[in-house]
Amino acid sequence: MSELFWFEKYRPRSFDEVVDLEEVKSRLREFVKSGNMPHLLFYGPPGTGKTTMALVLARELYGEYWRENTLELNASDERGINVIRERVKEFARTAPVGKAPFKLVILDEADNMTSDAQQALRRIMEIYAQNTRFILLANYISGIIEPIQSRVVMIRFNPLPKEAVISRLRYIAENEGVKISDDALETIYEFTQGDMRKAINALQIAAATEKEITEDVVARALGMVSPRLLRETLQEALKGNFSKAMTQIYGFVVDGGVGELEIIRQIHREVLRLDVPEYVKPELAYIIAEAHYATLRGARGLTQIFGALAKIRRLLKQAV
């Protein structure tokens, strides 16, 4: 297996290689076709393709000259807006290479910039608008000031669907000569919830421990409980077999080394999938949230887990 990070090794390099995101690809293809585009803001959760799509757009716009015409910056890495200003100024003062009418600046983690820095960024975008376009990347649109939002076309990136993530993981596993079970693929998706970067990294971590990846291999590699085992344990608790459930959970923590907060997070996911009336689910979520908060505050995690399971069983009995 290659030592290169698989997420980088298998990063798409064209629109056709990008899984899902059909609406986004359609809009960006129109910009490429017209040879012009506005400033853009890509926003959405981590691992949903924002950086990848920005780089694909650069390749599609500039072809072999995409590196010469593209400047990548990270707002959290740079030493301040003055550094960004100087780098953009130096980059924008020369003409684009090839036939492109403008150069491209990709600014990641733009929502981590202060309001003052974003105001300065807005002025930079206006000064160099004649021959430079900006793509701002952000996890949270609420972190971007309104004066910038009004000057860009905003494109939302949603968590990737399970089918798209699992298909990509299976493709990578085949290319790397790794055997992986369907249950293992499902477990990786459960752990990563539509974050493609996190999913591919999880696959690589699991593959580094075993050539044949099962659900249990994934769980051990990622420091989580096998979803199958957790569901079985939850069912024991809901049936009133607390002694058995407590023994199993104790084993997950002490013998398996799984963190109590991780177990609480997994219980939260499983509980909300129970076949119960919808009006009950907010109360279930609240019970789990209380246990999570108390554990974060220093309470003993196992005690919080056992207490939450008892409350959940009592609530579900009342709802029947």
Curated annotation (Swiss-Prot):
Entry protein name: Replication factor C small subunit 2
Organism: Pyrobaculum islandicum (strain DSM 4184 / JCM 9189 / GEO3)
Entry binding sites for ATP: G44, P45, P46, G47, T48, G49, K50, T51
Family from the record: Belongs to the activator 1 small subunits family. RfcS subfamily.
Top-level taxon: Archaea
UniProt keywords, alphabetically: ATP-binding, DNA replication, Nucleotide-binding
Protein's gene: rfcS2
Description of how the protein assembles with itself and partners: Heteromultimer composed of small subunits (RfcS) and large subunits (RfcL).
Matches recorded under Gene3D superfamilies: 1.10.8.60, 1.20.272.10, P-loop containing nucleotide triphosphate hydrolases (3.40.50.300)
Entry annotated with the keyword ATP-binding: yes
InterPro entries attached to this UniProt entry: AAA+_ATPase (IPR003593), ATPase_AAA_core (IPR003959), DNA_pol3_clamp-load_cplx_C (IPR008921), DNA_Rep/Repair_Clamp_Loader (IPR050238), P-loop_NTPase (IPR027417), Rep_factor-C_ssu_arc (IPR023748), Rep_factorC_C (IPR013748), RFC_lid (IPR047854)
Any Pfam family matching the protein: Rep_fac_C
GO CC annotation terms, alphabetical: DNA replication factor C complex
A Gene Ontology molecular function term of the record: ATP binding
